[in-house]
């Protein structure tokens, strides 16, 4: 099988490539250049798409004896990920750019080019598992990335490979060291790759500008002024510009955002609780829509935010009734549905949260 491996220059994708070679596949490595200004994006302690990352990936490819290329996806990444991120925050939403990148770049634009060039599959260093076409959680629960892959369609998954999903991260690093790969101890990435300073508010402010509004309490009393709703997200407690807790002495959190009026509402923690969720643009991993209610679990962020639920497709949207409340759920987040399974919880659907 001809396999294209997306190589970031990190340890995970490097071991993924090595395992594809071990399996006897015809392997080619490709590094995605996602920025027209290398160094303005980052992974770990260095820049994503930086010369260092590309060089690390190339050195691994040389050790493995596979061809290696750098493909420029900077324009597509800007349009489909960065601009989408900025526009979502301007609407008062909280998007996950990693979800969007997987959906529109790695398993869409990249996969389409790979298939057009005669490759059978695209392999990545994601921590997730595929068995019989079913997407499951990784063995390493702390590193599991099935959530950010939950938006993939059955057709996209048919051409995807996740070679490291059955192995804990410490063993991946040990394997890289045994193979003599210099990236064995390279730091993991944790922040948004296209915000090198880590200051999301400043990044958004530079692109959205000043859009004044008010911070109000549950009664509508104005507590403070702000420069734009892009500086807030549901569940936020710090940086609200207000004079401490409420009259009852309890902390206050962002509980609602109205981008049209520029209003940010704050309230006590219990105001964050939701028992129902609605999601648009649902994707069913099997490619088949359910015929009735589904007993499952829902996850609303990359790590944590999981509860039992009953999901039902109504008028093209997923309607969820939660068995226990979730807190800090924001429009724009992705909700991923799982079917519990002793062999690894299976992803069955996803959607973008529109109402909480």
From Swiss-Prot:
SUPFAM superfamilies: Adenine nucleotide alpha hydrolases-like (SSF52402). The record marks 126, 333 as: Interaction with tRNA. It comes from the Bacteria. Disulfide bonds join 101-193. ATP binds at residues 6-13, 32, 125. PANTHER family: MITOCHONDRIAL TRNA-SPECIFIC 2-THIOURIDYLASE 1 (PTHR11933:SF5), TRNA 5-METHYLAMINOMETHYL-2-THIOURIDYLATE -METHYLTRANSFERASE (PTHR11933). This is tRNA-specific 2-thiouridylase MnmA. It comes from Mycolicibacterium smegmatis (strain ATCC 700084 / mc(2)155) (Mycobacterium smegmatis).
């Amino acid at each position: 099988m001809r396999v294209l491996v997306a190589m970031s220059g990190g340890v995970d994708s490097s071991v993924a490539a090595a395992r594809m070679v071990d399996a006897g596949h015809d392997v080619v490595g490709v590094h995605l250049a996602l920025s027209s200004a290398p160094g303005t994006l980052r992974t770990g302690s260095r820049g994503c798409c930086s010369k260092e990352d590309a060089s690390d990936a190339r050195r691994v490819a040389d050790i493995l004896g596979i061809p290696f290329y750098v493909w420029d996806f900077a324009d597509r990444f800007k349009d489909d990920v960065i601009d989408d991120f900025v526009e979502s925050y301007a609407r008062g939403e909280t998007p996950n750019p990693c979800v969007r990148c997987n959906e529109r770049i790695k398993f869409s634009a990249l996969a389409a080019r790979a298939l057009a060039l005669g490759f059978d599959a695209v392999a990545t260093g994601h921590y997730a598992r595929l068995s019989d076409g079913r997407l499951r959680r990784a063995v390493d629960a702390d590193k599991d990335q099935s959530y950010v892959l939950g938006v993939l369609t059955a057709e996209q998954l048919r051409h995807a490979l996740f070679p490291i999903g059955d192995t804990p991260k410490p063993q991946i690093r040990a394997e890289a060291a045994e193979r003599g790969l210099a990236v064995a101890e390279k730091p993991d990435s944790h922040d948004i790759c296209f915000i090198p300073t880590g200051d999301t508010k400043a990044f958004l402010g530079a692109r959205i500008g000043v859009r004044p509004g008010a911070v109000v309490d549950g009664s509508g009393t104005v507590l403070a002024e702000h420069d734009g709703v892009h500086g807030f997200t549901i569940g936020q407690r710090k940086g609200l510009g207000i004079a401490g807790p409420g009259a009852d002495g309890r902390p206050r959190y962002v509980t609602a955002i109205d981008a049209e009026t520029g209003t940010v509402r704050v309230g006590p923690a219990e105001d964050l609780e939701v028992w129902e969720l609605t999601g648009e643009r649902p994707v069913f991993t099997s490619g088949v829509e359910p015929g009735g209610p589904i007993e499952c679990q829902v996850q609303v962020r990359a790590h944590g935010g999981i509860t039992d639920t009953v999901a039902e497709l109504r008028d093209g949207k997923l309607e969820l009734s939660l068995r226990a409340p979730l807190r800090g759920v924001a429009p724009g987040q992705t909700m991923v549905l799982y079917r519990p399974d002793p062999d690894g919880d299976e992803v069955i659907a996803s959607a973008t949260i529109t109402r909480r």
